[in-house]
Amino acid sequence: MTNGNGTPPEGAPSPQLNVLAQYTKDLSFENPNAPSSLAPQQKPPSISVQINVNANNVAQDEFEVTLTVEGKAEHNDKLMFRFELAYAGLFRIVNVPQENLPPLVMIECPRLLFPFAREIIATAVRDGGFPPLMLDPVDFVGMFRQNMERQAAVQQKPS
């Protein structure tokens, strides 16, 4: 509840987002063509990366948010490496209006997880014999909006 100007009334409990835990749920790195894939290449490989966010309400005010990052590098249609990471966090969110929960859970929580997931992937790729893969920043706001638009389109389709 607000006092009319968008701020909570004086004495109202303030919103809180707490990170209770962060953990790797699944990590896979494949280098199926080693050692030939480790030889110097004339041009850089083609790299593709897919990122998804899932969230589950696991207890009152607690959400498990999982950031899934899958990717591969190919050179001349030959797989150099492939990786998959499911990195999750357990978040406690209190004193937040129900209508504000989805963006908080699907934007802010993955934004907090991403730097850790990025480091895990960079290290796994480096340990696989390649230069570390530094993932570009992710627009979680854009991902959230696309998902909302997709859901709205599905709901508007006639049965």
Curated annotation (Swiss-Prot):
Q: Name one GO molecular function term.
A: unfolded protein binding
Which BP terms from GO are recorded? protein folding; protein tetramerization; protein transport
Query: Matching InterPro entries, A to Z?
Result: SecB, SecB-like_sf
Q: Does the keyword Metal-binding apply?
A: no
Query: Which GO CC annotations does the UniProt entry carry?
Result: cytoplasm
Q: Where in this chain does the entry annotate a coiled-coil region?
A: none
The protein's matches in Gene3D superfamilies, at most eight in alphabetical order, are given as: SecB-like
Top-level taxon of the source organism: Bacteria
Q: Which NCBIfam families does the entry mention?
A: PRK05751.1-3, secB
The record, for HAMAP family, names:
SecB
Q: Which family does this protein fall into?
A: Belongs to the SecB family.
Function in brief: One of the proteins required for the normal export of preproteins out of the cell cytoplasm. It is a molecular chaperone that binds to a subset of precursor proteins, maintaining them in a translocation-competent state. It also specifically binds to its receptor SecA.
What name goes with this protein?
Answer: Protein-export protein SecB
